[in-house]
Amino acid sequence: MSAFSGAELAYLRRDGERRLGRIATVGRDGTPHVVPVGWRYNAEHDAIDVGGRDLAATKKYRDAARSGRAAIVIDDLASVDPWRPRAVEVRGRAEAVSEPAALIRIHPDRVVSWGLD
């Protein structure tokens, strides 16, 4: 069974519509670090995979490897008039995967969504 609802999966699986998300990690000193990233839904692991150029050399990758925690929000605007934001936020265990290519895999502990109806 998926950690995501049917509406959340439909939103995440719309290829090419939402390729940018924002990942949040926590630095060694407790400071939050939030940056835009590319992502994809990984159906095999029911997780969000975050990738990027030279990812293993980044602060977000080191933070995720050290703390084992991360969050990501994937969002867009269904309409600007009226204002209708929609999003899926995933908080969970972060796995710093190194092979075959570096990525951060976020396994959901908590999923919150809004505006998907």
PLM segments and residue spans:
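Short beta-strand segments
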Residues: R18-R53
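Structural motif
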Residues: H45-A47, R69, R110
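Short hydrophobic/aromatic-rich beta-strand segments that constitute the beta-sheet cores
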Residues: I48-V50, I72, S113
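Short, basic/aromatic recognition patches
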Residues: M1-R22
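Short, structured beta-strand-loop surface elements
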Residues: D54-H107
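Flexible glycine-rich active-site/ligand-binding loops centered on an Asp-His dyad
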Residues: L103-D117
